[in-house]
């Protein structure tokens, strides 16, 4: 879809051309000024009247009425040059693509160098451009018998730049991979629970593994029973759908060492079990496998980019249902690690299945662990819906993950786990651990519980309950699943040291 070319005004013939504008006179002396001269100063008049603005996020569409060349100019406001960041540029590009989508543009061009600064170079701008295209134009296909509109696609986008074409093409490829992988995760999270069971999720993972030549294994219920995965099996007791433990292995080094373990919560629908959720809280619980989707999305990107790392992805998959066989409050279960757990809340099931998955990942070579889960409503109370909560037992690992999150624009905020928090999850009088010792510090209790299974292995817990979905349309996509943490995990794996 992307074509990279050097600028030559004599050859520029397009339905639409986007030009970036920074506040100040400098940007008007470049390409914008060139078109202003060709149009007899009319653009300057429109700028004076406020119809063309350099304020960040403002987009002005100008019909040139020229007999040849560019039919429409899109002036894209970028704000102050010194304030432009990768994330802000990505959002602006997203707004531009949503504008083109609404106008049904299928062919366009961008003067890339008008969107760059000393801190955001052409390669970064190209990455932001490609990523923003896929994120901003995403739509969940849905299940309506008749679609109101055909699927949109920008068939051709010419990127004009003076930078090295091969480098720009490489950046466009990486940005496309990030965007497409995020959209894959979005689609998984948006899929209804009756159409995405644990078996369906396992089938998806197998197809992914075959596509990218990963080693894989799907552990069935019988194997879990043999191994002693009592925590995952307990959560699955009330379901007619069999549980699955999905294991994907990407080996980017000669030796299977320094393995990064990515563990994603895969609860395909959560009723809360016998600690039943109220109706309003149960709506959208199809999204409770957002952690699994993030890990699978990251594995898709890793399969495309082939970094020199070793990655083990482990996804415990089940739903949490009610039946005569379902697990109950006051049950005591034995996890794969051998630690016993007193169940005080059947709606605190995510940490149970993650316990067995983390133990399994450690047993199969993971030396670093990152788990991703829509774990607690408490993290939303604490941090809102734009920040992912993080907990860790290792400063160095967390700092690398934090750097990746800042690079990709997926904001994370660290919450503490103290010795008193650990004492609370160890507070059961009849078992090693209590899965829900109270509402106070609820998000931290979830992380502290999972940390009991990470033990001394460097580990970061990411609670995406607030960030996995959004209720409103934005510059980078529609309401629904966000695919959060796909990009952060991918960037982390690529740059891990």
Swiss-Prot record:
The active site is at residues 277, 351. The keyword Membrane does not apply. It is an enzyme of class 3 (hydrolase). One of its GO terms (molecular function) is manganese ion binding. Binds 2 manganese ions per subunit. Disulfide bonds: none annotated. GO terms for cellular component: cytoplasm. SUPFAM superfamilies: Macro domain-like, Zn-dependent exopeptidases. Mn(2+) 1 binds at residues 270, 347, 349. It is found in: Cytoplasm. Its EC number is 3.4.11.1, 3.4.11.10. One of its GO terms (biological process) is proteolysis. CDD domains: Peptidase_M17. The keyword Hydrolase applies. Belongs to the peptidase M17 family. Presumably involved in the processing and regular turnover of intracellular proteins. Catalyzes the removal of unsubstituted N-terminal amino acids from various peptides. This is Probable cytosol aminopeptidase. It comes from Geobacillus thermodenitrificans (strain NG80-2).
């Amino acid at each position: 879809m992307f074509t990279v070319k050097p600028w030559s005004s004599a050859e520029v013939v397009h339905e639409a051309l986007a030009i970036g504008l920074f506040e100040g006179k400098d940007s008007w002396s470049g390409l914008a000024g060139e078109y202003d001269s060709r149009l007899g100063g009319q653009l300057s008049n429109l700028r004076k009247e406020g119809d063309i603005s350099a304020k960040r996020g403002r987009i002005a569409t100008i019909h040139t009425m020229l007999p040849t060349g560019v039919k429409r100019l899109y002036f894209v406001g970028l704000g102050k040059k010194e304030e432009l960041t990768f994330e802000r540029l990505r959002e602006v590009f997203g707004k531009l693509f949503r504008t083109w989508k609404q106008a049904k543009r299928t062919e366009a061009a961008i003067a890339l160098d008008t969107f760059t600064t000393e801190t955001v170079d052409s390669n970064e701008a190209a990455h932001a451009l490609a990523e923003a295209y896929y994120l901003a134009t995403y739509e969940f296909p849905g299940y309506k018998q008749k679609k109101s509109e055909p699927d949109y696609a920008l068939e051709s986008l010419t990127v004009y730049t003076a930078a090295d074409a091969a480098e720009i093409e490489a950046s466009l490829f990486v940005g496309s991979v990030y965007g497409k992988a995020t959209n894959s995760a979005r689609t998984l999270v948006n899929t209804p629970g009756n159409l995405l069971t644990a078996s369906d999720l396992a089938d998806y993972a197998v197809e992914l593994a075959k596509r990218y030549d990963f080693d894989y294994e799907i552990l069935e219920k019988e194997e879990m029973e043999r191994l002693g995965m009592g925590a995952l099996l307990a959560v699955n007791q009330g379901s007619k759908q069999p549980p699955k433990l999905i294991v994907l292995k990407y080996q980017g080094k000669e030796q299977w060492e320094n393995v990064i373990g990515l563990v994603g919560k895969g609860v395909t629908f959560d009723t809360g079990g016998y600690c039943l959720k109220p109706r309003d809280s149960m709506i959208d619980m199809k999204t409770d496998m957002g952690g699994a989707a993030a890990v699978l999305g990251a594995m898709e990107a890793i399969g495309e980019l082939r970094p020199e790392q070793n990655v083990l992805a482990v996804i415990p998959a089940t739903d949490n249902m009610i039946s005569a066989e379902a697990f109950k409050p006051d049950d005591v279960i034995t996890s794969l690690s051998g630690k016993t757990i007193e169940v005080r809340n059947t709606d605190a099931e995510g940490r149970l299945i993650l316990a067995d998955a983390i133990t399994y990942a450690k047993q199969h070579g993971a030396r670093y662990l990152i788990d991703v889960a829509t774990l607690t409503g408490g993290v939303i109370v604490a941090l809102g819906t734009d920040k992912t909560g993080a907990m860790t037992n290792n400063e160095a690992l967390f700092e690398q993950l934090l750097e990746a999150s800042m690079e990709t624009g997926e904001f994370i905020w660290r919450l503490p786990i103290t010795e008193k928090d650990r004492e609370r999850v160890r507070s059961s009088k009849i078992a090693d651990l209590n899965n829900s010792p109270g509402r106070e510090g609820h998000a931290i209790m979830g992380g502290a519980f999972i940390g009991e299974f990470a033990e001394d292995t460097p580990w970061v817990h990411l609670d995406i309950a607030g960030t996995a979905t959004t209720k409103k349309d934005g510059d980078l996509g529609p309401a629904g699943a966000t695919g959060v943490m796909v990009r952060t995990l991918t960037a982390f794996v690529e740059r891990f040291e």
